[in-house]
Amino acid sequence: MRFSAVAGRYARALLNVAIEKEKEEEYLRFLDLVCQIYESSRELFDNPILKPEKKISLIKEIMKSFGQEMDEFQERFLTLVFERKRQKLLRNIRDLFEYEKILSEQKVPANLSIAHSPEDEELSLLRKFVRKYALKDPVFDISIDESLIAGALVEFEGFRLDTTVQGRLKRIAREALKRGEMS
């Protein structure tokens, strides 16, 4: 996924407010809910005829139906986003907010692809590995991919560890092609 520089500025600004108010998790849940609301009715929220104030009041009403309230900073944030017609960046802003939040906690985001649901022991070993090289605790974004057959693929800070059967088979095939053993 490509991230927008504009989305990064919005995400960092909102994160700064969240850190100041000590409500990082609450603001992340707020962004999750706003993204779900926006994505479920994209045509409505992208309609140029509707005023930004009306769009925000609709979001407020929907949030109330879920038992959620919006504070003044969240409302001002949404006002800026909708007035400047940046609502299409909401998912990007949410993802960057989460990424920046992890970095602000002195942790490292890491992608973990694994063929099955990971057990605690496996996660512990992978945490130790990432800690050894990144010198920070990892926050795993876990995805299950059965095509890997077995093993795990970990990516963090530009580093990639591939212990999957699929990865090994690809390396063997690549080496065989280099040597001219396969035609």
Swiss-Prot record:
Please provide, in alphabetical order, the Gene Ontology terms of the cellular component aspect for this entry. Answer: plasma membrane; proton-transporting ATP synthase complex
Please, which domain of life does this record's source organism belong to?
Bacteria
**Membrane-topology descriptor:** Peripheral membrane protein
Give a yes or no for keyword Ribosomal protein in this entry: no
* Subcellular location(s) of the protein: Cell inner membrane
UniProt keyword Ubl conjugation, yes or no: no
GO MF annotation: an example: proton-transporting ATP synthase activity, rotational mechanism
Which Gene Ontology biological process is one annotated for this entry?
proton motive force-driven ATP synthesis
Q: Which InterPro entries match?
A: ATP_synth_OSCP/delta_N_sf, ATPase_OSCP/dsu
Q: Which UniProt keywords apply?
A: ATP synthesis, Cell inner membrane, Cell membrane, CF(1), Hydrogen ion transport, Ion transport, Membrane, Transport
Specify where it is mainly localized.
membrane
The job of this chain, per UniProt, is described as: F(1)F(0) ATP synthase produces ATP from ADP in the presence of a proton or sodium gradient. F-type ATPases consist of two structural domains, F(1) containing the extramembraneous catalytic core and F(0) containing the membrane proton channel, linked together by a central stalk and a peripheral stalk. During catalysis, ATP synthesis in the catalytic domain of F(1) is coupled via a rotary mechanism of the central stalk subunits to proton translocation. This protein is part of the stalk that links CF(0) to CF(1). It either transmits conformational changes from CF(0) to CF(1) or is implicated in proton conduction.
Instruction: Identify the NCBIfam families for this entry.
Output: ATP_synt_delta, PRK13441.1
Q: Which PANTHER family match?
A: ATP SYNTHASE DELTA CHAIN
> What is the name attached to this protein's record?
ATP synthase subunit delta
In its UniProt entry, the species of origin is given as: Thermotoga maritima (strain ATCC 43589 / DSM 3109 / JCM 10099 / NBRC 100826 / MSB8)
Q: Corresponding gene?
A: atpH
